[in-house]
Amino acid sequence: MTEKTIRRQSVSRRTLLSGTAGLLGGAALSSGTALAQNTAPASTSAPVNSPASPRSPDPAWLALRQEEIIEPGLEIVDPHHHLWDHSGDRFLLDQLLTDTNSGHNIAQTVFIECGSMYRADGPVEMKPVGETEFVNGTAAMSASGRYGPTRLCHGIVGHADLRLGDGVARVLEAQTVAGDGRFRGIRHSVTWDATGTLPKARTNPIKGQMYDATWRAGFARLAPLDMTFEAWLYHPQLLELADLARAFPQTTIILNHVGGPVGIGPYKDTKAETFAQWKTGIAEVAKSPNVVVKLGGLGMLFGMFDFHTRETPPFVVGAGARL
């Protein structure tokens, strides 16, 4: 279940896909492909069933729940995983293979940027190209067939700083070359919160980042190159994303983690209000046909459900059931 890798949290693909509608108050959500979305962000303290490192998995806890493989013949493209080598948490080719060989029919995977293996020197704006070079090497290893039929990292989504405006064009060109036919688009995370208490992305976004004229000038460079934009934000920013989608109808926007409904900090005891705000925002985003949504990320530590505090990993009996 490869999207355990964003921070290697504990809830399975089956749980997240079948339980999304129920968890979000019965909202009608659907997906045309099986999406592996099993994520949790870093936290400042270790939760009950997590090891000391917020990035690290807890294999013993995960092993407490063994789920039946559903439709093992169904061909799946995993649209969201990472690769990294952090202190106490390595998730590279071998670990990815463990997940993709768990019994599901994973045909291909898509790598999503996570700040790994940036270039150590050279122009600052070009350092993210190192990540693509690294991932493309992993993809080439997989394409050799030595590691089985799954084509790992067959698509690569990297990073380019859209705050460069028109200047981002040279970074996108370099990313395309480094990807050797696999580069598909970028993610420039814009997670920002008015309370200032939620984790911010390494991009250090500002209030109204997606309205910024220079940022939008950079964004405008994506469509001519047929590149997608992966949107990672918090639910109060959904209306901002809807405006962006209307302004750039030719750019495909892929909304990460169901629009980021938050359940920590000042949002911990306001789930009803959060759902209402999320529902309004996601409905507005849905009006733009150039936006698609990844169903998942509900196990992330910023979310509303505190799965990581349970004695055993959660399990969904039927679609729409509450955990």
Regions found by a protein language model. Give the residues of each.
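Short acidic/histidine-rich active-site segments
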Residues: I253-H257, K294-G297
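Boundary at the C-terminal end of the N-terminal hydrophobic targeting segment
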Residues: A34-A36, A42
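Conserved, mostly hydrophobic/aromatic
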Residues: H80, T109, I156, L222, ...
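An N-terminally biased module of ancient metal coordination in phosphate/nucleic-acid-related enzymes
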Residues: L16-L17, T44-G148
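H/E-rich (His + Asp/Glu) clusters that bind or coordinate divalent metals
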Residues: A60, V262-L323
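N-terminal secretory signal peptides
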Residues: M1-V11
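Active-site gating/metal-coordination segments in enzymes
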Residues: V48-L64, P123-Q237, D243-A247, G259, ...
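N-terminal export leaders
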Residues: V11-A27
